[in-house]
Amino acid sequence: MKRSKRVACVEATAVVALSMTSAGIAHADDELVVNTNPAASREAPADLSSLKPVVNVLAAPDTSSIVPDTGPSPYVPGVNTQSGIVTDAQTRAYGSFAIPYTTGRVQDGNQSALGTTSANFLSTTYPYRAIGKLTFSAGYCTASLIRRSVIVTAAHCIQSFGSGSAIYSGWQFRPGHYGASGATSAQIAPYGTWTWAALVRPSTWANGTDTGSGAARNNDIAVIAIAKNASNQFIGDLTGYLNYGWNNYSFVSSSKTGNLQTASVTTFGYPALLDGGAIMQRTDGPTYTTTVSGASQLWQGSNLTGGASGGPWIVNFRARDAVLSGGAAVGSSPNLAIVGVTSWGSADPNASKDNYASQFRQNTQYPNATYGNYGSGNIASLLNTLCTTAAPGGGTFASQGYCN
């Protein structure tokens, strides 16, 4: 992966460290930043091609001796759906042994940018359109919607590890982005360009004390509230948004897979290695839980390199349900859910490819089983901190509808 320069904060002027630790209240390891100048400079579509992918610049730890976890999660798995929190000890996933994978463009038919409209692009249909390119002062990453107007990405897309209050600036989100040569403005931003309103990243990422070594860290995760557009609309009302799960949600251990904790996971991103980061890419394959230098990680074969950072790792992914025949019964429907975001992986395009994600889960920094109405562990705490924060215009981001 390529290195990116560190850029000091330009717009963000309110940094808040929270110290309350009881269940349901923001955890001490959350740090909030509010955009006090949302009308600040924005990149023009023509400038996007000059941006570089932002990657995790920390050194990769030694992975020569890592092995997948074989035991179950010590915590109760759960998923936050649009109907509320569901805890399910019988979550299911399907996969095969070893780490094979497939990668391809998210497209439908002939996806030439010339002579077509955004309606032809698979990336503008749900659930793909809840994923998009996140641009900012240092380059670009990938992000996805997990609440009505909240996206999740990697903490290293907010700031360099251990850089304190020095963060990047100018975050903008383009859901369903397609930027191949000759793309029209409607294809580049089919649902518009959206500006950040506030963000939360772990204080242990900011101060450089997060559990792990090098790039492998417990909490390379951040959430960003997206401001409403000029028509006073929330982004999620146009695109929809995705569920998120925690604590090995949909992972299972079976003798068929060597008693490894595994799930079938689909990951998305805009890696610079593939189509120059201009087109959304998808990787499918079995994924395992593991521990690298003390950090809880998800592990998958993948060639989604720099630019895919912050992209979602989704279990039970499906876009269109098939019609069953031959007497087959539907059975209980598994929940599509994001269980982590891309953090780091192999940088050599000709070497064995593997990627790692900071897992959504309870851990040393985020031990609580409940953070407000948002579930367990790191992802829930970050959301709880963001959503209970005072928002411009009065009330909180939750009361204004951002976190529905």
Where are these regions (language model features)?
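C-terminal segment of classical bacterial N-terminal signal peptides
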Residues: L18-I25
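Terminal peptide-recognition signature
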Residues: L134, A143, S149, T153, ...
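Catalytic nucleophile loop of clan PA
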Residues: N303-V341
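C-terminal cap/linker of serine protease catalytic domains
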Residues: N335, V339-T342, S346-N404
